[in-house]
Swiss-Prot record:
GO terms for biological process: ribosomal small subunit biogenesis; translation. It comes from the Bacteria. One of the primary rRNA binding proteins, it binds directly to 16S rRNA where it nucleates assembly of the body of the 30S subunit. With S5 and S12 plays an important role in translational accuracy. Belongs to the universal ribosomal protein uS4 family. The keyword RNA-binding applies. InterPro entries: Ribosomal_uS4, Ribosomal_uS4_bac-type, Ribosomal_uS4_CS, Ribosomal_uS4_N, S4_RNA-bd, S4_RNA-bd_sf. This is Small ribosomal subunit protein uS4. The lineage of its organism: Bacteria, Pseudomonadati, Pseudomonadota, Alphaproteobacteria, Hyphomicrobiales. Part of the 30S ribosomal subunit. Contacts protein S5. The interaction surface between S4 and S5 is involved in control of translational fidelity. PANTHER family: 30S 40S RIBOSOMAL PROTEIN (PTHR11831), SMALL RIBOSOMAL SUBUNIT PROTEIN US4M (PTHR11831:SF4). Residues 18-49 are annotated as: Disordered. The gene is rpsD.
Length: 205
């Protein structure tokens, strides 16, 4: 198993936080990392360690994005006008896999990536199988007709653990969603605190 495909709950345990707010997370029962040394008391992190942890947590949240891809997103964020940390969040939220997850078409961000790869999703009426595809404001995302009644989709629609954020207009009767606006950090329903400014500091060293 590659690091990118690391089990989602292992990420929770490594971070010591339930980063997606899921009821089955092992962190709900124990707050230590994976492995035989997971229960050792951790010392105070250095500034570098705190910044690195913030980066690992955000990368993990968005499906364990590869370092190369994540850094490319960061570079794009720094070239945009405005706050680089806010821009970073906005770019991550514009990813197709993120919107499919936010719209509650699938239960997890990992499932969103697989769902898209398998050709179940259309953008503005055309099939797109690239999870990192960057949406624009006004784009419509929908589950293709043959996939709308899949158990995975119907069960995800009913998940009580999270709501569809207000920057996405989702219609579960049609299994479609419209990307209304690019959110800021405060708009994104993270289950734990995310600190993109620390990631900017990390890469700016």
């Amino acid at each position: 198993m590659t690091k990118r495909n690391e089990a989602k709950y292992k990420i929770d345990r490594r971070m010591g936080q339930n980063i997606w707010g899921r009821p089955k997370s092992p962190v709900n029962k124990r707050e230590y990392g994976p492995g035989q040394h997971g229960q050792r008391r951790k010392g105070k992190l250095s500034d570098f360690g705190t910044q690195l942890r913030a980066k690992q947590k955000l990368k993990g949240y968005y499906g364990n994005i590869s370092e190369r891809q994540f850094y490319a997103i960061y570079v794009e964020a720094t070239r945009m006008k405005g706050d680089s940390g806010e821009n970073l969040i906005g770019l991550l939220e514009r990813r197709l896999d993120t919107v499919v997850y936010r719209a509650k078409f699938v239960p997890t961000i990992f499932a969103a990536r697989q769902f898209i790869n398998h050709g179940h999703v259309k953008v503005n009426g055309r099939r797109v199988n690239i999870p990192s595809y960057k949406l624009k404001v006004g784009d419509t995302v929908e589950v293709k007709d043959a996939s709308k009644q899949l158990a995975l989709v119907l069960e995800a629609n009913q998940l009580a653990e999270r709501d569809v954020p207000d920057f996405i207009d989702a219609d579960h009767n049609k299994q479609s969603a419209k990307f209304i606006r690019i959110p800021q950090l405060a708009d994104v329903p993270f289950a734990v605190q995310m600190e993109p400014h620390l990631i900017v500091e990390f890469y700016s060293r």
